Amino acid sequence: MADDAIKNITVRDVVRPLVATFATSLGQKTRMHSIIIRVRLKNGAEGLGECPTSFVMPNENAQAIRGMIEASRPGLIGRNVSEYAGMAIELRRKYPQMPMTASGIETALWRAWLKFSGKDEWKWFGGASDAIETDITVPITRDEAFISGWIGRAVRMGFKTYKIKVNGDTEKDHWLIGRVVALLRHTGKEFSLRLDGNQAFSVQSCLGLCEHVNREGYPVELFEQPLKRDDLHGLKELTRFSPLPVILDETVFSRRHLETVINEGLGHGVNIKVAKSGITESLAIVDLAKKNRMKLMAGCMIETMTGLSAGILMAMGTDAFDHIDLDSIHYLHHRNSYGDIGIDGACYRRVNRKS
């Protein structure tokens, strides 16, 4: 067995309460549940990856994640970790309904390979920038006290961009957006908004909300995934008529999906998440999107810094993203640093530049 051969793969569950109920059009949760993967090589080098659970992939639950890892382990043990990209392709082909698990495994393999090779994650991504600033998500709610507290906390932490979850209920969406705007305007500080429909809208209801926010003069930058992920006809129509850029999330998990989007004219940009696409495929999507002058957003699931850090370092290292949506750690109790990443409110900074 070569020194870079995979010796062992272990998993553990992480279940943590959220500091606020995370509610979208797809559901709500008060705690997060991820499976953490540890890959150990013959020479002792290790890498960690995270497989989160999400409303987006309800069948990819903790039990299913563990089952896939257990079934995949025999085919991975003994192989050279430098083949991580090929192994990820194999896993995605064999388990097409388990993209986040394949991504978590790939991230752990990739990190073990980096450790074995003496490479730094940030530098491997390009080392282009050492700081990024994220937005923060405002969940669907009618709780006046919560909204006031959540926005007040975010303002004190230095957030300037707010991604509001909406669900196609006209009255509720108007109230929530209006309340957030009123609270932010009261601070006297500049701010911007993003809307995230999580597949809850029709073409007409989306255009109606776009018209409303424009009429009210709200500073909205974009509308993320308003329609069903596979509503290609609707996305094409919406892309043509929407006054706001349409950013696709659930519609794009792979470069093949993005090729369809580009060829059919289905959106103005894409939300790239390491948690859903992994390392190799995420970078391929970045490259393809840039070549076609699409807007790029760096996003995440509800995940710990084990998984989120890969997205942060990708965004920093490539400096390729127009929008940063890497805020999941702010739904958890957390420290002010993780490895070489410092966490200062809305800002992530690389704090160790010796490597």
Regions found by a protein language model. Name each.
Residues 302-355:
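C-terminal alpha-helical cap/extension of soluble enzyme domains
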Residues 164, 170-301, 305-309, 332-343:
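Catalytic core of soluble alpha/beta enzymes
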Residues 136, 271, 325-326:
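Structural signal for conserved beta-strand scaffold positions within catalytic alpha/beta enzyme cores
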Residues 78, 119, 244, 294, ...:
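Short glycine/serine/threonine/alanine-rich loop segments
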Residues 2-193, 198-207, 211-214, 241, ...:
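N-terminal capping/lid subdomain adjacent to the active-site entrance of alpha/beta enzymes
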Residues 111-115, 287-290, 312-316:
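Short glycine/serine- and small hydrophobic-enriched flexible loop segments
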Residues 4, 157, 218, 265, ...:
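Structured loop/turn residues at beta-strand edges in well-structured enzyme cores
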